[in-house]
A protein has these predicted regions:
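ATP-dependent adenylation/nucleotidyltransferase module used to activate substrates
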Residues: 1-175
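A polyampholytic, Gly/Pro-enriched intrinsically disordered region
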Residues: 85-87, 177, 203-208
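Short amphipathic alpha-helical interaction/hinge segments
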Residues: 149, 207-210
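Flexible, glycine-/basic-rich loop-and-beta segments that form/coincide
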Residues: 170, 203, 210-212
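Short cysteine/histidine-rich metal-coordination sites, predominantly Zn2+-binding motifs
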Residues: 188-189, 209-214
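Short, intrinsically disordered, charge-biased short linear motifs at domain edges
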Residues: 172-174, 179-188
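Short clusters of hydrophobic/aromatic residues that line enzyme substrate/ligand-binding pockets
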Residues: 74-75, 79-82, 185, 196, ...
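Local cysteine-cluster metal-coordination motifs and their immediate loop/turn environment
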Residues: 104, 183-204
């Protein structure tokens, strides 16, 4: 029996990353999840990520990092998370170079355990406008891998990059992702606020998919 290809999954516990985890398992990858505790106000996503990994019996690592310079309303609790904003420009919830940081950890992990692929649930259709969610960013990072690692042939896969939020939700349902266990809200409350970018994009997706969000 051929050996399964090892894959590193960047898992936040949100809708997109959870769908990516289930997608990778469905494709037959030997999945290893990376979960980040980086001082985000919405720490509930961490417990959601752990639940998703445990449900699929996927080994996971929680990486705790500090970004003391903050630079984002997700990190600075004195700053307000924007609500009901027009989806134009880069919002204050953008964390400087976050995906670059996360992918660097994933790349190191991949090299160390011999993983051939890294999967991230980035999306460039229904998104908040973050520059590190664009296809061009991942194309550039692929060059970083080639030039800066011994392994060189590790691939970064973005299976959701061109899907609408409604399409992601339909894929999640097809893959039997427990959507009720995912967490998308940027606020740190016990219930989703319904008005931050992430909540609104999620609601838009369920509405477009003609489904109710449980």
């Amino acid at each position: 029996m051929p050996k399964k290809v090892k894959a590193i999954i960047l898992l936040s516990g949100g809708l997109d990353s959870s769908t990516t985890l289930y997608y990778a398992k469905n494709k037959g990858y030997d999945c290893h999840a990376l979960i980040f505790d980086y001082g985000q106000r919405h720490k509930r996503e961490i417990s959601s990520a752990v639940v998703q990994a445990k449900r699929l019996k996927v080994p996971y690592e929680i990486i705790k990092i500090k970004l003391p310079w903050k630079g984002s309303s997700l990190l600075d609790k004195k700053a307000k998370v924007p609500t009901n904003r027009k989806m134009k420009g880069i919002p204050s919830t953008y964390v400087p170079a976050r995906n670059t940081i996360f992918l660097s950890f994933a790349l190191s992990y991949a090299e160390a355990i011999g993983a051939k692929v890294i999967l991230i649930g980035a999306n460039a259709v229904d998104f908040s406008g973050y520059p590190d969610c664009r296809p061009s960013f991942y194309e550039a990072f692929q060059k970083v891998i080639k030039e800066g690692t011994k392994a060189q042939k590790i691939k970064v896969l973005t299976p959701l990059i061109d899907l609408s939020k409604a399409e992601i939700i339909k894929l999640a349902i097809k893959l039997k992702v427990p959507l009720e266990l995912t967490w998308s809200c940027y606020q740190g409350g016990k219930k989703p606020c319904g008005v931050c970018d992430s909540c609104r994009l999620r609601d838009k997706g369920f509405t477009s998919a003609f489904l109710g969000d449980s």
